[in-house]
Structures are given as structure tokens and as C-alpha cells.
Design a protein with these regions (language model features):
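Bacterial Sec-dependent N-terminal signal peptides
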Residues: 1-14
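Amphipathic interfacial helices
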Residues: 90-91, 101-109
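Short, flexible active-site-proximal loops enriched in glycine and acidic residues
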Residues: 106-110, 122-131
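Active-site substrate-binding loop specific to GH73 endo-beta-N-acetylglucosaminidase modules
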Residues: 42-47, 56-63, 67-79, 84-96, ...
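Residues that flank catalytic or metal-binding motifs in active/ligand-binding sites
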Residues: 22, 110, 185
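N-terminal mature-domain "stem" immediately C-terminal to a signal peptide or N-terminal signal-anchor/transmembrane
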Residues: 11-64
Length: 337
């Protein structure tokens, strides 16, 4: 005989995290799960709180940085024939050390995802600026869990981005000549870093007009408006001098206290375009007539421009979808976004 009932205690209301689930989560939230990290996650609680506890602990950890190691590798005195571009190898080696052995795994994972959105490259103009490129990645690591508006400002004014997308040294127009503000950063900031080319629904799907065509987010007039915002910014004064101008400021090649390769670009008012600037128009935009008024300071123009971009309804779905693709799944559903 015997009973056919299930018997025994009922299953726990909140079961523990399964080992396979822990590995899957850590393979997305770090640079690879191990037996020890999976066990530590499982030991934090059941499947309702262990993940949040792990994430909270990761957020509290300080960033593992790159540039201190690159600075330490700079020789003193500098030998004949020293190639400063070789320090890019130090940055890469330190990056691998941080992501494979660093304690701040989630921060490094998110910073890596951000580096695939907010892109600079050591190839070309940045090849001989290894401290700027290392510090740029450090900016992403420090801001990995912060506000995207704050990060956009740091990225915009970072010399690595300034050199890479030619905002550094961008000059105002000169009447009677062909000299006009460089549009490179204005275009890429919108197209790649914030809103994309077409209007989106909150789930990341493309909005359509009455004819079924996608709706562009901006046009050439808006590109030119933002290009005028991004004029007048260049290297900060070298730490070895007390005053400098747009024309004579220069990059400091060697690391030193307060050196300008890792300081935000400085505004030189004499080269900032002070006229009106057309910006993005959308429901909820606060600038009258989608225009930055004439006569403002360069700092105020920059703040208004970044607010105008950051508050655009595309930013959430556009950036979120990219981060989901880098961190979780390459083809997220609209419901996921």
C-alpha cells in the first residue's frame, strides 16, 4: 500500500538562487562568473534579495582606474627615442587587469558598455595622448552608476573627445570667409550618443508619420545650431603658465600636477559664437521657439544645449536599448526596452 500524496514540507516561498542562475547573472553583470563569485552571490539570500544586495555592494565599491598606472609608466628622465604612444599598451594591460581581477566588476562591465556608446579611439589623433584616453575610460568608470546628463557633460568637455570629434579648437564663424563652426561633435552627439536619427516610442520602436515614414529627430539647421554651441573650447592653460589664450594654449605631453591632458576643456570667450542657436523641438522642451538666445555665456549655452538633448524623449529608449544590447541580450524585445 502506501499513500500517493506528495508529503513533506511545501517548497519555500522564496527559493534560493540556483547555481545556473547565479552563473548566468554574473556572466552578464561581470566579466565572467567563477565558482567563488557564484557561491558568494547565492550566499547573499534567496532569489528575491540576493541580486539587489550584490548590486548594492558593487555600486558602493570605488572605481579601479587606468590613468594612474599609465602616468606611473612615464619615464623620468625621458630616454632618447622614447615613443609616448607605447604607453597605450600600458593602458590596455591595466584595463585587462581591472576587468579580469578587479573588485569592481559591475562598474567595469557598465563602463565597458558605455565605452561602446561614447566612443573614442587611440588610433589617429589620440595616439600620442595616452593619458587623455586612459582618463576618458576612468570618467566612464566613475560615472557608470550616475546620471547620464552629468556623464554627457564630462564626455563633452573631455579633451579625448574634443580631439577625437574635433570640438577642441572649434572656432566661431568669421564673416566674409568660409570659416564656420565644425559640425562633427554636434552631429555625433545626437546621432550616436543620445537620440538617434529618428523619433522613437518609449519601447524603442520607430515612430511613423501619417504616410508611414520615420520622423527625423533633427535637420541641418539644428546641427548647425549645436555646432555654434560647441565653439570656443580648447586645452585648459598648461599648469606651467598662469594665463593663456585660445591661440597659444597647448597640450602638456608629460604628466604633471594639474596637467591639461586630463582636465576639462576651457572656454575661451573670444572664440565662442554668441548668436542665437536652433536646437531640438519636442513636447516638453523648455527653450522658447527651440532656440538658445543670443548673448549668453558659453557655459550657459552648453548647459542649455545638454539639457535640451538630455530631456528629449528619445534618450531613454535609445540609450537603454544600447546598454541592454551590450549587457544582456543583442536583440531585446520592445517590451523589454
Amino acid at each position: 500500500g502506501g499513500s500517493s500524496g506528495s508529503g513533506g514540507a511545501p517548497p519555500p516561498t522564496n527559493p534560493p538562487v540556483l547555481k545556473a542562475e547565479a552563473f548566468r547573472f554574473l556572466n552578464q553583470a561581470s566579466f565572467g562568473a567563477t565558482e567563488s563569485t557564484a557561491s558568494a552571490l547565492i550566499g547573499l539570500g534567496d532569489n528575491t534579495n540576493s541580486y539587489s544586495r550584490w548590486i548594492d555592494a558593487e555600486i558602493a565599491k570605488p572605481a579601479s582606474l587606468l590613468n594612474p598606472a599609465v602616468e606611473a609608466a612615464f619615464p623620468n628622465p625621458v630616454p632618447n627615442g622614447f615613443n609616448i604612444a607605447s604607453l597605450n599598451n600600458v593602458r590596455v594591460e591595466k584595463w585587462f587587469e581591472n576587468v579580469l581581477r578587479g573588485n569592481d566588476q559591475l562598474r567595469q562591465r557598465v563602463a565597458f558598455a558605455l565605452s561602446q556608446v561614447l566612443v573614442v579611439s587611440q588610433v589617429g589623433a589620440l595616439q600620442n595622448l595616452p593619458f587623455a584616453t586612459a582618463d576618458f575610460q576612468d570618467v566612464l568608470a566613475r560615472n557608470a552608476f550616475g546620471n547620464y546628463r552629468d556623464l554627457l557633460r564630462e564626455v563633452t568637455l573631455h579633451p579625448a573627445m574634443g580631439v577625437y570629434l574635433s570640438m577642441l579648437g572649434n572656432q566661431k564663424a568669421v564673416a566674409g570667409t568660409n570659416l564656420r563652426p565644425d559640425e562633427n561633435y554636434a552631429r555625433e552627439l545626437m546621432q550616436l550618443f543620445s537620440i538617434g536619427l529618428v523619433e522613437l516610442n518609449l519601447d524603442g520602436t520607430v515612430k511613423k508619420d501619417a504616410t508611414g515614414a520615420p520622423i527625423p529627430t533633427y535637420n541641418q539647421d539644428i546641427i548647425e545650431g549645436f555646432a555654434r554651441v560647441f565653439t570656443g573650447w580648447k586645452w585648459d592653460c598648461p599648469s606651467t603658465v598662469t594665463t593663456c589664450t585660445f591661440a597659444n594654449t597647448r597640450v602638456q605631453v608629460a604628466p604633471a600636477s594639474g596637467y591639461n591632458q586630463v582636465k576639462p576643456m576651457r572656454l575661451y570667450a573670444e572664440q565662442h559664437e554668441t548668436g542665437t542657436k536652433r536646437v531640438l523641438s519636442y513636447t516638453g522642451a523648455t527653450l522658447a521657439n527651440a532656440t538658445i538666445p543670443a548673448g549668453q555665456s558659453g557655459d550657459k549655452d552648453l548647459a542649455d544645449a545638454l539639457d535640451n538633448i538630455f530631456n528629449h524623449p528619445n534618450v531613454g529608449p535609445f540609450v537603454a536599448k544600447q546598454l541592454i544590447q551590450k549587457l544582456v541580450t543583442s536583440n531585446p524585445s520592445p517590451a523589454y526596452v
